[in-house]
Amino acid sequence: MQQTVTYGAKWKQFLTIFTPIVITQLTLFSMTFFDTTMSGNYSNQALAGVAIGSSFWAPVNAAFSGLLMAITPIIAQLIGAKKEKQVKNTVHNGLYIALFLAFILILINFLVVPTILTHMPVTAEVAHIARHFLNGICIGIPAFFISAILRSFIDSLGLTRVTMLITLCTVPFNIFLNYCFIFGNFGFPEMGGAGSGYATGITYWLVVLVSVILIQTQTRLRKFGIFKGLTALRFSKVKEIIGIGVPNGLTILFETSIFSAVTILMGAFGTETIAAHQSANSVCTLLYAFPLSVASTLTILGGYETGAKRLKDAKQYRHIGMTAAILIGCINGAILFFFRDIIAGFYTNDAELSDLIMHFLVYAILFQFADAVLSPVLGALRGYKDVAITSIIAFISYWLIGLPVGYGLSFTNLGPFGYWIGLSTGLFVAAFILSIRVRKTERKLSLNAKNAEISS
């Protein structure tokens, strides 16, 4: 990364960082896409089981990744402030936190999740598939969190192409393992939907291996000496990571868990509805890669410029990100509307299930416009390290407004589609409130900078 002067130069740097991130996110989300489609091609029961299992893993995955992503703005600001020597210890303390969290989650999976599954309104077969899907995921949880730290370190330096290379190398391996474990090919056991969990868990370890190799061989990464001895656990650094990471993780948890809660509530409408909801939701997850990548880009660039005390530049990057996200939202909405029948055909050959998926995709258009505003705002706030209030706003918007609206509408003739209207309502409320917040934060940072100049 480097300082830019003109809007054209800023757009170029924005796209240079954004493009590899979006390719990475699309490739990562394609893992979920192939888990869903390949399980659906095995059976509707397998698809429903993966949907329930994913409803547990997805919010945990996103929330804890969000917590660990706290090192991205921390390192970006250190680089902007020319404090590169502090980067190694930041990464190491992030790794210590990651391993501790992995241990806790594995315990929860084996001690708590089975009890929850037995009390859910799903068939015994679906619960069994979900249980073994999660056991497979557990194999790779430590690797997943380690790779999250290493990916955040790489991205915070603006070297998003490296992350892209890592992902492009590993996802085809995941698809191959899905083919082996789900359908029992090449002498592997036929595990159905549960096999996609084992395929994903094993793939996470490959991601770590490739990440370590690239960090050790790329000059711009090797110079930080990440793997040259361990640095001490610093509680001040842990406190900083937790202070940014917990609100960030909770914000993501409240958003992703609301979708998981809706998946569970869909059980009242039957297996077919769960399968249709999961299929449409996997499409939304894939498209969400674009606004999410805008947010990640703004976190990196905003953190870098804030660390360098160039607040005007950070604000200009936010405007660029907002423009890009809105354009992307319009394109995604058009794709969902005009190609919904083709998209549904990827998931099933069943005419009734296909019709349900298409109906969900129409309501998913609302998500595209809400995320077009919300995601870049969240990315900018993370770059500014102003995340304390975001989790509170997310909880109110999603759980106290969005879910009750959706629950109420589900008793009307909208049925299960009412939940998706409720979800959209929550996203729009959060987008509106946080848009006000980011402007207030920028004014506060500018005022603090001016006061610092006067006092000096």
From Swiss-Prot:
User: Its domain of life?
Assistant: Bacteria
Molecular function terms, GO-annotated: antiporter activity; xenobiotic transmembrane transporter activity
Q: Which residues cross the membrane?
A: 13-34, 54-76, 95-117, 132-154, 161-183, 193-215, 244-266, 286-308, 321-343, 358-380, 387-409, 414-436
Q: Does the keyword Ion transport apply?
A: yes
GO CC annotations, alphabetized: plasma membrane
Membrane topology value: Multi-pass membrane protein
Provide the primary localization: membrane
**Location(s), subcellular:** Cell membrane
Alphabetical list of Pfam families matching this protein = MatE
Q: Which PANTHER family match?
A: FMN_FAD EXPORTER YEEO-RELATED, MULTIDRUG RESISTANCE PROTEIN NORM-RELATED
Role played: Multidrug efflux pump.
Question: Which protein is depicted?
Answer: Probable multidrug resistance protein NorM
Please give the organism.
Listeria innocua serovar 6a (strain ATCC BAA-680 / CLIP 11262)
What's the encoding gene here?
A: norM
